[in-house]
Amino acid sequence: MENFKHLPEPFRIRVIEPVKRTTREYREKAILNAGMNPFLLDSEDVFIDLLTDSGTGAITQEMQAAMFRGDEAYSGSRSYHALARAVKDIFGYEYTIPTHQGRGAEQIYIPVLIKKREKEKGLDRSKMVALSNYFFDTTQGHTQINCCVAKNVYTEEAFDTGVKADFKGNFDLEKLEQAILEAGPANVPYIVSTITCNSAGGQPVSIANLKAVYEIAQRYDIPVIMDSARFAENAYFIQQRERDYRNWSIEEITREAYKYADGLAMSAKKDAMVQMGGLLCFKDESFFDVYTECRTLCLVQEGFPTYGGLEGGAMERLAVGLYDGMRQDWLAYRINQVEYLVNGLEAIGVICQQAGGHAAFVDAGKLLPHIPADQFPAHALACELYKVAGIRAVEIGSLLLGRDPATGKQHPCPAELLRLTIPRATYTQTHMDFIIEAFEKVKANARNVKGLEFTYEPPVLRHFTARLKEKA
């Protein structure tokens, strides 16, 4: 199938879900009733749902078949052992705890690592600083509710939509080491390597960067956790862009990358393709004590450590999905679909972040320059896009970033982005063309889009349940 301009989807569609078409008047009422927050819309009122790729896509026939192998034993399930074997084979990690999703893993390992630092070093957690190339929102939230500061140390070009670079998700290594020294190494309970870097636009992190981060962390005795939601997409970018790995398979690159962390936390609802599931895993016996404490916390918060909130069939499906998500042809199709959308948007003058792995990120600050950051231009754009075309997208900007817990002031945001997240094997090229046409209509009316203000602001993860109204 070489030398074709566009390759079709590498699958056949066997089951479909009808969606309803709505009028502009209907959608205006719906978004108003939802408090100008797309998260609060009913899914039946959404024509194309680009809110997230987390558990919203299709699954493979092999994953569906695996459900019927499920062992629903409360403890010692053979389905757990199938999952643990897959983790060992793919990542090389010895110890596996299943969780209901990614934040289930976070609510276990984060307090354990912070408490471990307190106990061993006799430190005050309020002085601790956790570091990342960019924390995902729930990872940041769990860090903050455990009284620890979450700090991002990304590269200068990460959020510059005018710059193209192979690995815009990389850590700034100089800033990382500086942040460690400023906080004091003992006050850094963990470093999170987020691959791909969602908040920067699904941008990849190179193996060279992961290795350098791990070397710095080991020098200062700081554990590294890999936020692994999109591990396969990151491996694909490494294969395509990092010279030393161009002839490596996705499986080989994945195994190599995970040498440079001590543990992984995963929302398996992304690259592992399941509707529900997560993982918390540790590499070897050097983290056995942490693993043991995490198992205990899992008992309290998720369930017995050999099911962790998942039924046996779901663990079987996850074990298969980890492999299916690494298929070379599948990843090529998925990355090219995102690139097609980004290229189409830029062709009509809509500025985007460089095409990443799972979504197109529109620079809302440039499309709506008349709306200041504290009136949430990307969220305003999301509301307008829904009104125009029934498309639901999500803000990655000031609304998501939130306030400084100590001062209550809005965190400065490096970019105001609207994320158009593409669920796996769900939408076709025709859908991408419709999205591009919708943006033509939005762009033509951009100057009339209004900023937003709160009518209800939750204290944590406010973007999920906040209610807003248009500024007068």
UniProtKB/Swiss-Prot annotation:
GO terms for molecular function: tryptophanase activity. Its cofactor is pyridoxal 5'-phosphate. Keywords: Lyase, Pyridoxal phosphate, Tryptophan catabolism. Its EC number is 4.1.99.1. It catalyses: L-tryptophan + H2O = indole + pyruvate + NH4(+). Pathway: Amino-acid degradation; L-tryptophan degradation via pyruvate pathway; indole and pyruvate from L-tryptophan: step 1/1. It is an enzyme of class 4 (lyase). The keyword Lyase applies. The modification N6-(pyridoxal phosphate)lysine is found at residue 270. NCBIfam families: PRK13238.1, tnaA_trp_ase. Belongs to the beta-eliminating lyase family. Homotetramer. This is Tryptophanase.
